[in-house]
Amino acid sequence: MFNSNVKLGIAPIAWTNDDMPDLGKENTFEQCISEMALAGFKGSEVGNKYPRDVKVLKKALELRDMEIASAWFSAFLTTKPYEETEKAFIEHRDFLNAMGAKVIVVSEQGHSIQGQMETPIFDGKYVLNEEEWKTLAEGLNKLGALAKEKGMKLVYHHHMGTVVQTTEEIDKLMDLTDENLVYLLFDSGHLVYSGEDALEVLKKYVNRVKHVHLKDIRKEKVEEVKRDKLSFLQGVRKGAFTVPGDGDIDFEPIFKVLDDNNYEGYLLVEAEQDPAIANPLEYAIKARKYIKEKTNL
């Protein structure tokens, strides 16, 4: 299954959480990438503890035969002047380009509640009006063109608590943006968490999917988040997310759809939970074994 153009990566968020720095504050950058390599992963996304000096970061990764797959970028197209987002995006793009990454993960954070510790994730979500949708789509097309200038692709990350979370919102985004400039990051965990049919979304947009986050969920924890009106970050602390093979999502059909459509790019494990409860190395190995078992990668 899969051709040689599919690579496996893992996100540092299991070791150190950028949104809640107390989670994994004891884990160093070096420990993080060493354990990723030890678990059998090739790529990583960029975390807060990663050096931003290209030379320093490259050397640390090359010693472990690793590379940067991408890094998250927060856009504020619906709440701030476009120029502010563009300036930050160009800087981000150039750093990732220097690191050899091919995709740029973008999420609209205007009106987002994902980082609010007390706002219930299932109740407090903002919904864009038509004018805001237009602004978002136009801005993303411009950023996508800037990515293309460097031979890179903008991959949009639908995410819990943001203005693009549901199937309906993904449909709208895909419809309003240029398919040659704005691509999709498929995240299994965020779709299932939201109550969407992740497989159907993948089937519909598989040809625009250029980056994949493999995230599993624990359904009973998500139900708890819903019932107790918890925030996204409270849900993370509760253990709503975990690695593929440890939760309730069946990844076999997901792998099959990607393989059948000749997916190329990264399959990147991203599962934020408390490292004091879920040992990052242990869970990285667990994820790696599961992927090997299901895909032979």
Swiss-Prot record:
Annotated source species: Clostridium perfringens (strain ATCC 13124 / DSM 756 / JCM 1290 / NCIMB 6125 / NCTC 8237 / Type A)
Keywords: Cobalt, Lyase, Manganese
Enzyme Commission number(s) of this protein: 4.2.1.44
Catalytic activity of the protein: scyllo-inosose = 3D-3,5/4-trihydroxycyclohexane-1,2-dione + H2O
Pfam family name, one: AP_endonuc_2
GO molecular function terms attached to this record: manganese ion binding; myo-inosose-2 dehydratase activity
Similarity comment: Belongs to the IolE/MocC family.
Cofactor(s) this protein cannot do without: glutathione; Co(2+); Mn(2+)
Gene Ontology BP term (one): inositol catabolic process
The name this protein goes by in its record: Inosose dehydratase
Pathway this chain belongs to: Polyol metabolism; myo-inositol degradation into acetyl-CoA; acetyl-CoA from myo-inositol: step 2/7
